[in-house]
Regions:
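A helix-coil-helix interface module used to build multimeric assemblies
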Residues: 2-208, 216-229, 290-291, 301-305, ...
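Short beta-alpha connecting loops at secondary-structure transitions
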Residues: 21-25, 78-79, 288-308, 330-345, ...
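Alpha-helical transition-metal enzyme core signature, strongest for iron centers
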Residues: 37, 87-90, 101, 137-144, ...
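Glycine-rich cofactor-pocket loops
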Residues: 149-171, 280-297, 330-337, 362-382
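A short, charged helix-loop
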Residues: 226-243
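A conserved active-site cap/scaffold subdomain adjacent to cofactor or substrate pockets
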Residues: 244-279, 288-349
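Active/binding-pocket-proximal capping segment
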Residues: 281, 404-411
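Long, amphipathic alpha-helical stalk/connector segments used for oligomerization, subunit docking
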Residues: 312-398, 404
Length: 484
């Protein structure tokens, strides 16, 4: 730590991965500004922008070459000096660029407004950030699918209201988590595919400045918009904007990221509950400490952390929506400070959550003996309806048998609540005259109560996960080492 006094953002210093951290860093942001200024100047030159005489090219190749030579050598200290004086970040960087590229000073930002660089840069960074999220999502889906395949046949106790319900399998439960993330992947892919460039729209979105530069040539202004977009890697531009692109786009993207964190929180919470039941544990390092006081503790701290980070991201769509709602007329500056916080942190937080998921799901420890014990405590109750039908088939009285089962069930439950280690309902029914000749043991085979759970896992993997794996084969078998 070089300076322990200033606050640092834990998303950057502890949780998010380096690619996402660098994506939202100052170098990438302002280098993209310079690339946007170059793209605009190139497009204006290619479309024949002329000087006041209507003949001489307004932009020459030497100026463009100079801009290309200074895309990344940004003097941030000098830019900070300019901003303290000008109170305007875009103008500060225009002056900073002009000092190292004096030939090009007069053509930088020609016809543009600040949102030409700020908004278009945000769109570029968000699209790349969505790609990073997509890639990690594929890794999570792949890892959970492998876990579901491995444990698809292991019976476990299902819960509704966190009370014992019917049986499912460990793999089927993982398939539920996996499918949620597949839905998130589709939403992220949709957002990437629908993201448009703001383009060159001018101060209020009318393109008046560019129409003036091109002497009233509407077609050239339209081509300028499209050409700049293509140079920056976009196929489509927003058809209309105010000074900014619609902030609903931000809300849609942040909501998609929150959707990923929503699924992660569900998965993480389930893992924490299962850790309490001692059925599944997250990875635990050889020298990891669970508590400074209680040396025996083994807490699901990674799942807890991912839930904590997920909740943070889940709160951000409301801020994005409020920003979109308060964009007065063509634009206010209400959005600026909030977006500087919300957009990077939504991506950093989501990246951190997915890193944790990759790490946790790659090392889950399943405890079949504990799971079987829990199944054994409840399975006798589940078997009672089958036993009742079997006894009736042998000539028993349905109502009388029902009363026998009720009486023995409550007695066995009372014993468990008083400290008994095993459910005695099976033994009670086996020795009751009312169930003579009924094969009680056969009724206690867990496989009889799984329904189609193993088959459902196979179908999910072959019909839903397999296409994802095929499309993103280069992203399979991911892992991630956490800093803390």
């Amino acid at each position: 730590m070089t300076d322990p006094l200033p606050y640092d953002n834990p998303l950057v210093t502890r949780y998010a991965g380096r690619p996402m951290v660098e994506l939202w860093g100052p170098q990438r942001k302002h280098a993209t500004w310079r690339r946007l200024w170059l793209a605009l100047a190139e497009a204006e030159h290619e479309l024949g922008l002329t000087a006041d005489d209507g003949i001489t090219p307004r932009i020459n190749p030497e100026q463009l070459a100079e801009l290309r030579a200074h895309l990344d050598d940004i003097d941030f200290d000098r830019a900070a000096e300019h901003e303290r004086r000008l109170r305007h970040d875009v103008m500060a960087h225009i002056h900073t660029l002009g000092e190292v590229a004096p030939l090009s000073r007069s053509i930088v930002h020609l016809g543009a407004t600040s949102c030409y660089v700020t908004d278009n840069t945000d769109l570029i960074l968000m699209r790349e950030g969505l790609g990073l999220v997509r890639d990690r999502l594929v890794g999570v889906i792949d890892g959970l699918a492998r876990f579901a395949e491995q444990w698809k046949d292991l019976p476990c106790l299902g819960y509704t209201h966190f009370q014992p319900a019917q049986l499912t399998t460990v793999g089927k439960r993982a398939a539920l988590w996996c499918y949620d993330f597949v839905l998130d992947l589709h939403e992220i892919e949709h957002r990437i595919g629908r993201l448009r460039f703001r383009g060159a729209k001018g101060t209020t979105g009318t393109q008046a400045s560019f129409l003036s530069l091109f002497r009233g040539d509407h077609e050239k202004v339209r081509k300028l918009d499209q050409l700049v977009a293509r140079k920056m890697g976009f196929d489509e531009v927003e058809p209309v904007t105010g000074q900014t692109y619609s902030r609903k786009v931000d809300t849609q993207i942040v909501t998609a990221l929150a959707g990923v964190c929503e699924s992660a929180h569900k998965c993480g919470t389930d893992l924490r509950l299962l850790a309490h039941e001692q059925e599944i544990d997250e990875p635990f390092e050889a020298e990891q400490v669970g508590s400074s006081a209680m040396a025996y503790k083994r807490n699901p701290m990674r799942a807890e952390r991912l839930c904590s980070l997920a909740r943070f991201v889940l709160g951000l769509p409301a801020v994005a929506a409020q920003t979109a709602a308060t964009q007065w007329l063509e634009r206010t500056l209400d959005d600026s400070a909030a977006r500087r916080l919300v957009l990077p942190q939504a991506f950093l937080g989501t990246d951190a959550v997915l890193r944790l998921l990759l790490n946790v799901t790659a090392g889950l420890e399943v405890h079949p003996a504990v799971i079987a014990r829990h199944v054994g405590q409840v399975l006798p109750y589940m078997a009672t309806e089958n036993l009742l039908m079997a006894a009736v088939a042998k000539g028993g009285d349905r109502q009388a048998l029902h009363e026998v089962i009720r009486r023995h069930s409550h007695a066995a439950t009372a014993e468990l609540k008083e400290g008994a280690s095993e459910n005695t309902l099976t033994q009670r029914l086996q020795t009751d005259p009312a169930f003579v000749g009924v094969d009680v043991t056969a009724a206690l085979d867990p496989a009889r109560y799984l329904g189609r759970a193993p088959q459902q896992v196979k179908e999910l993997l072959s019909e839903v996960v397999a296409p994802v794996r095929s499309q993103y084969a280069h992203l399979l078998n991911q892992s991630d080492e956490l800093a803390v």
